[in-house]
Amino acid sequence: MRSVPGPSPPCTRSLAHSCRAAARGPCGSARPRARSVSARAHSSEASDMARVQQNFNSAGVGLFFSLFGGNQSLALPHLAAPDIRHVDWRALKAAGFKGLVFDKDNTLSLPFALEVEPRLQPALAGCLEAFGGRAVLYSNSAGLQQYDPEGKEAAALEAALGIPVLRHADKKPGGGCAELEAHFGCPAPQLIMVGDRYLTDIAFGNRHGMLTVHVQPLTTSGEPFGVVMARRIEEFWVARWTSFGVHPPAHSLAPHDTLAAYVKDQPIA
């Protein structure tokens, strides 16, 4: 792991502002599919297994404490946006990136829901079109060997969202990137990691040299208590480290002075 200073802070309208605002609140083919499901269906299709396992992440806890000894840059995203509608995916593809790695809950869908959040569906469709469908879901429940050994959760997500779910052995931020590189057929630094959690999604992507994109959670309603508390702690420390001048790791395909161009104040789609 490394801490690489950069000439400018991570791109966002202001990462520190984004974090503080949040704290104030409580290579496969894919096409997105819109599903008409009610809140009742959302509740009935929620995974009890996922609810239990999200309360504790030993790899995330271990990384959090290690950051106090250095390498705080691992928790800082290259791009920070309200949601995926504010990111210029076509420009990122033109910069040389070859694939997208998405977290699911609170990034593309409400927690445990089996549908893409309706307001994000056009943006996701455009995003997948820009990358030729080269996207995958990387979940800390579905597809994870420990909790989904037979791939039933993964298969349900694939059928519902129309995006491949990566089968893998370790929870983010732990584990390697061999499965991702095998899936996409390219090295990890040519991939983009997108998620709403600093110490899981962003730290995992940065550990393996990906470009990292942090989005604000779609909601905190329905999240396990442990996740809510962990999120508040993450937001506090990321805002603090950013205010101290810590930057995300440098990336050869997206130098620090180019990052601002990839995030827009108004939704692109």
UniProtKB/Swiss-Prot annotation:
Keywords: Chloroplast, Hydrolase, Lipid biosynthesis, Lipid metabolism, Phospholipid biosynthesis, Phospholipid metabolism, Plastid, Transit peptide
Biased segments, Low complexity type: 29-46
SUPFAM superfamilies on file: HAD-like (SSF56784)
Single GO molecular function: phosphatase activity
Residues carrying the site annotation Required for phosphatidylglycerophosphate phosphatase activity: D103
Xref: InterPro entries: HAD-like_sf, HAD_sf, PGP_Pase, PGPP1/Gep4
Effect of D105N: Normal phosphatidylglycerophosphate phosphatase activity. Impaired phosphatidylglycerophosphate phosphatase activity
This protein's GO CC annotations: chloroplast; cytoplasm
Subcellular location: Plastid, Chloroplast
Catalytic activity: a 1,2-diacyl-sn-glycero-3-phospho-(1'-sn-glycero-3'-phosphate) + H2O = a 1,2-diacyl-sn-glycero-3-phospho-(1'-sn-glycerol) + phosphate
Source species, domain of life: Eukaryota
Chain positions covered by the region annotation Disordered: 25-46
Record's function text: Phosphatidylglycerophosphate phosphatase involved in the biosynthesis of phosphatidylglycerol (PG), a phosphoglycerolipid predominantly present in chloroplastic thylakoid membranes and which has important photosynthetic function. Required for thylakoid membranes development and chloroplast function.
PANTHER family in the record: 4-NITROPHENYLPHOSPHATASE-RELATED (PTHR19288), PHOSPHATIDYLGLYCEROPHOSPHATASE GEP4, MITOCHONDRIAL (PTHR19288:SF25)
Homology family: Belongs to the HAD-like hydrolase superfamily.
The name this protein goes by in its record: Phosphatidylglycerophosphate phosphatase 1, chloroplastic
Top-level taxonomy: Eukaryota, Viridiplantae, Chlorophyta, core chlorophytes, Chlorophyceae
